[in-house]
């Protein structure tokens, strides 16, 4: 919906472009919050809706390092812009989708793959934005930071994380 590069992802083999799109026109476009993720095949020109039947915002796809999985942010209901942002993962070989944030009563935003089994993200906790991770094999979500500040992004880089942190008393700074 906003048109940034975070709404695009290439599959590891470079043959498909995953993109976010709201394929509506006129008033329907203006009133709808239903976006989907589409896979455009660069070899044959075919486009497939990967999130068909999911009625809220589906956006910001990220592909796992091994190319097998795609994670994305998803809202459940159309027309409800304040809906919880869920963390979904799809197996790109089978099409199976899993909501890993079911039972996690917070948003999951700014998804980044650490390795093939870990997704790092930002979530709000008691009016602060903190760093969390999802361990895919167990489904366990772990909170890694706590304080009177906001983390605005997190990037896994091998054995360490880089993150930007802001507070009322400090401008944005990069931490590791």
Listing of model-derived features with the role each one plays in the protein:
Residues 12-15, 143-146, 174:
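Secreted/periplasmic carbohydrate-active enzymes, especially glycoside hydrolases
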Residues 154, 172-175:
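Conserved glycine-bearing catalytic or ligand-binding loops at nucleotide- and phosphate-handling centers
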Residues 8-16, 61-69, 111-118, 154-160, ...:
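Blade-terminus and WD-like Trp-Asp/Gly-His loop motifs, strongest in beta-propeller folds
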């Amino acid at each position: 919906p906003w048109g940034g590069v975070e709404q695009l992802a290439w599959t590891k083999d470079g043959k498909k472009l995953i993109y976010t799109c709201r394929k509506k026109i006129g008033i329907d476009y203006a009133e709808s919050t239903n976006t989907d993720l589409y896979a455009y095949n660069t070899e044959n020109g075919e486009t497939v809706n990967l999130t068909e039947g999911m009625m809220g915002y589906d956006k910001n796809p990220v592909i796992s390092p091994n190319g097998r999985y795609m994670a994305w942010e998803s809202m459940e209901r159309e027309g409800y812009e304040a809906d919880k942002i869920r963390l979904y993962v799809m197996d790109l070989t089978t099409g199976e989708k899993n909501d890993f944030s079911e039972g996690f009563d917070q948003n999951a935003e700014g998804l980044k793959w650490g390795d093939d089994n870990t997704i790092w993200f930002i979530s709000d906790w008691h009016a602060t934005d903190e760093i969390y991770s999802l361990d895919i094999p167990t489904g366990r979500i772990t909170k890694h930071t706590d304080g009177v500040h906001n983390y605005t992004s997190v990037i896994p880089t091998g054995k360490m994380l880089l993150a930007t942190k802001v507070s009322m008393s400090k401008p944005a700074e990069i931490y590791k």
